[in-house]
């Protein structure tokens, strides 16, 4: 199954969107596709001799082949480690749709697939006038949902899926990522999620200790049709 561009969102912040996106990039590359990542808006950046840099965006850059310029991967790098809308206000920056679309177009010219990682959960806005649904519509790409497996994941997963669909967008798959290694009844919860979510299931990632190379997990994810 040959995939094209898609947007990775999650049921919350801190549920592994970046790590899953890196795994997906390695999976695509393993299939012979040129795949690059994009983090349109990132907060919590640190300053270096090359400018403001975000850890998640750097991870996406490292997982990409070819390797795009950082400014294309992360057009808006915001210092404060808070919600992007607040971070942009503090930085005196207005997040605009046009630069994001332009960067995506340039990345698309370099690769077969662009994996675009969102911010926080699906309903997290990008500025006062548009949210992630607005960006996804502008890019004309579908959505992949990362479900963080922990207590409350059923509610979060169903609400996120319903919100994506209510926005009129296509959700082509969901991935279960174990956040809490001590979560009770993981398999039972996973089975219920597979029954209740009306979108294709792409696979389950166990709890991953820090330092694991995402390339080693590329075979664990299986988009529908594999």
Curated annotation (Swiss-Prot):
Enzyme type, top EC level: ligase
Localisation: Cytoplasm
The protein's annotated pathway: Cofactor biosynthesis; biotin biosynthesis; biotin from 7,8-diaminononanoate: step 1/2
Record-linked InterPro entries: DTB_synth_BioD, P-loop_NTPase
Pfam families associated with the record: AAA_26 (PF13500)
Main location: cytoplasm
Tagged with keyword Hydrolase: no
GO biological process, one term: biotin biosynthetic process
Active site: 39
EC number(s) on file: 6.3.3.3
Functional description taken from the UniProt entry: Catalyzes a mechanistically unusual reaction, the ATP-dependent insertion of CO2 between the N7 and N8 nitrogen atoms of 7,8-diaminopelargonic acid (DAPA, also called 7,8-diammoniononanoate) to form a ureido ring.
HAMAP family: BioD (MF_00336)
Name of the protein described by the UniProt record: ATP-dependent dethiobiotin synthetase BioD
Gene source species: Xylella fastidiosa (strain Temecula1 / ATCC 700964)
